[in-house]
Swiss-Prot record:
Record's keyword terms, sorted: Disulfide bond, Fimbrium, Signal
Protein name: Fimbrial subunit type 1
Record-stated family: Belongs to the fimbrial protein family.
Localisation per UniProt entry: Fimbrium
Signal peptide residue numbers: 1-23
SS bond partners: C44-C84
Naturally occurring in which organism (per UniProt): Klebsiella pneumoniae
Lineage top rank: taxon: Bacteria
Keyword Lipid biosynthesis: no
Classification of source organism: Bacteria, Pseudomonadati, Pseudomonadota, Gammaproteobacteria, Enterobacterales
Length: 182
């Protein structure tokens, strides 16, 4: 009886596995993978994590930005340089390029405007390691950082900067950067 039951179980399992083996194979489109990069002839290579990063400034109350010149707490972010060779260059500096909020605030990034819901009277200020606000012209470089062979980290800070009484809403801004080696 037990052998007969075992034989039935084994035959059932074999019939199920043969049915699975005969199932049709189906292929579907999956999507696209983008590969981005750049080959450079420079003293260092910018780390992939620094090329396209997001700095989270978080939520800041309008009460903290209620008058021109007020600012939020600064958030640290870094630009990392890899594979540096100090026989090629010993110093690096960074310049940022973006739309300034106006001619009197050339070191404050204008916010991305959306049709509705954007904050007003506020922008984003980028500070170098000395705490100096950086002009957003793409030509004014941060204070120089002395390079070491290998990996180097250049620290920056970002904060909200009020140009008047800030109103609530989305407060996002973008800037590109370039690195100068000497």
């Amino acid at each position: 009886m037990k052998i007969k039951t075992l034989a039935i179980v084994v035959l059932s399992a074999l019939s199920l596995s043969s049915a699975a083996a005969l199932a049709d194979t189906t292929t579907v489109n999956g999507g696209t993978v983008h590969f981005k990069g750049e080959v450079v002839n420079a003293a260092c290579a910018v780390d992939a994590g620094s090329v396209d990063q997001t700095v989270q400034l978080g939520q800041v109350r309008t009460a903290s930005l209620k008058q021109a010149g007020a600012n939020s707490s600064a958030v640290v972010f870094n630009i990392q340089l890899n594979d540096c060779d100090t026989t090629v260059a010993t110093k690096a500096a960074v310049a940022f390029l973006g739309t300034a909020i106006g001619p009197t605030h050339t070191d404050v990034l204008a916010l991305q405007s959306s049709a509705a819901g954007s904050a007003t009277n506020v922008g984003v200020q980028i500070l170098d390691r000395t705490g100096a606000g950086l002009a957003l012209d793409g030509a004014t470089f941060s204070s120089e950082t002395t390079l070491n062979n290998g990996t180097n980290t250049i620290p920056f800070q970002a904060r909200y900067f009020a140009t008047g009484a800030a109103t609530p809403g989305a407060a996002n801004a973008d800037a590109t950067f370039k690195v100068q080696y000497q």
